[in-house]
């Protein structure tokens, strides 16, 4: 968050684009205010291998595998060639991960209870 305030330009990637009324209904969930954002891009699964709460889980198996990969420069180069430079875009990356990983990262829906913040 602090990096966004210090940046000259901020391109925000979002799991979901929602109406302004949704954001205003719970402003405490806004991490980066619009005043510092230059562009917003809809990029599902952009947090992988990390998680996006309510969308998908943390890919712990990825992090364990990365520990091994990152032990050598050659293995790291091979990984980057395959998974970063070797995919056309984020969608191709997600498809390359495959259905088994997609399924493993699914999280059950658990809606929060409404809270009255008053009119904003």
Question: What name fits each language-model region?
Answer:
Residues 1-120:
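Metallocofactor- and cofactor-centric catalytic cores in central/energy metabolism, strongly enriched
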């Amino acid at each position: 968050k602090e990096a966004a305030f210090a940046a000259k330009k901020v391109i925000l990637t979002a799991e979901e684009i929602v109406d302004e009324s949704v954001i205003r209904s719970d402003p405490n969930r806004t991490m980066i205010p619009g005043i510092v954002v230059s562009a917003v891009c809809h990029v599902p699964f952009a947090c992988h291998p990390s998680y996006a709460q309510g969308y998908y889980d943390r890919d712990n198996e990825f992090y364990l595998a990365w520990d091994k990969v990152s032990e050598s420069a050659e293995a790291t180069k091979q990984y980057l060639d395959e998974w970063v430079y070797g995919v056309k875009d984020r969608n191709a990356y997600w498809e390359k991960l495959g259905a088994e990983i997609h399924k493993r990262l699914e999280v059950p829906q658990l809606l929060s209870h409404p809270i009255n913040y008053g009119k904003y």
